[in-house]
A protein has these predicted regions:
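Extracytosolic ligand-binding ectodomains
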Residues: 1-143
Length: 143
C-alpha cells in the first residue's frame, strides 16, 4: 500500500481478510490505508446473527478487547464440530466428516451457514472499509 500510494496510485484497493490486521497500518502508514476494502468474516458493528452480540460481549468481558474475525471463526469451527458430533451421535472421524458435510442453517457468530456439495460454507460476509487505519465502516452482506 505504501509503495502504491507513494507512486501516486490512489485507486480503491480490495484486498484479502488479512489486510485488516492492525500491522498493515503500522507497516504502510495510516495515511496510506484509506480507500481500502476487504471481506471480513465477523464484525461487532455488523452482527450477522443473534448469537454474535452476546459472544462479542462475553469475549470482551473475559479478555478486555473485541474478538477478531479469526477468533470468531475459531469459535464457530468448534461449535460446528460439536453440532456435527451431536447430529451424528458419534465422535468418530467419519461421523464428524459426515455431520459437517450435512450441516445446514448453522447459526454461528460469523453468520448463518450451510455446507455446500463441495464442502464450502455458504454464509454472509462483512464488507469492511479501512479509514485512516483507525476506523471502519462495516456492511453485512447476506447470501
Amino acid at each position: 500500500l505504501k509503495q502504491m500510494r507513494d507512486m501516486g496510485i490512489n485507486v480503491p484497493v480490495i484486498g484479502p481478510d488479512g489486510i485488516g490486521d492492525p500491522k498493515t497500518a503500522e507497516i504502510a502508514g495510516n495515511k496510506n490505508t484509506s480507500n481500502v476494502y476487504y471481506a471480513a468474516h465477523f464484525s461487532v458493528d455488523a452482527p450477522a446473527t443473534k448469537v454474535a452480540t452476546p459472544f462479542a460481549k462475553a469475549y470482551k468481558k473475559a479478555y478486555g478487547k473485541e474478538p477478531s474475525q479469526f477468533t470468531a471463526l475459531a469459535y464457530d469451527s468448534v461449535r460446528m464440530i460439536k453440532a456435527a458430533i451431536e447430529n451424528e451421535n458419534s465422535t468418530s472421524k467419519a461421523a464428524i466428516t459426515k455431520g459437517l458435510a450435512n450441516l445446514k442453517n448453522f447459526e454461528g457468530v460469523t453468520g448463518k451457514m450451510s455446507i455446500d456439495k463441495d464442502h464450502n460454507p455458504v454464509k454472509s460476509m462483512v464488507s469492511r472499509e479501512v479509514i485512516q487505519a483507525l476506523h471502519r465502516v462495516d456492511v453485512l452482506i447476506k447470501f
